[in-house]
Amino acid sequence: METTNIILCGLGGQGVLFMTRILAETAMHRGQKVVGAETHGMAQRGGSVISHLRLGEAEGSLIRSGTAHYLLALDEHEAYRYLPFLAKGGKLYVNVEPGMFPRPEVGAHIKSNKIVYRCVAATKIALD
């Protein structure tokens, strides 16, 4: 079984750790091995939160830069911050209005690394 590397990021209070727990429990329920790590220093004050989730035959809990298969960003700015974690051909899901991402200066990086991205206005959907 291969390893699937997932980075989840956002700001304190957005539910990054909760979303990580849901994905981890779902994977375990399906019989997959799960390893993870999280960083949430100033999260209580709206600071950056990042969670590493590795499914399958992972050696260690941290995901190296350029090796994540998926990046799930609950905040647009955090998507830019953690974009270097994505592998070439990785998939990026961002909580932002469609058409508002990416910034032009980042578009070239996304295109050259064949990153597939999808914008979902998740906050707006949740509030409606």
Predicted regions and their residues:
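Active-site cofactor/cluster-binding pocket
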Residues: 1-128
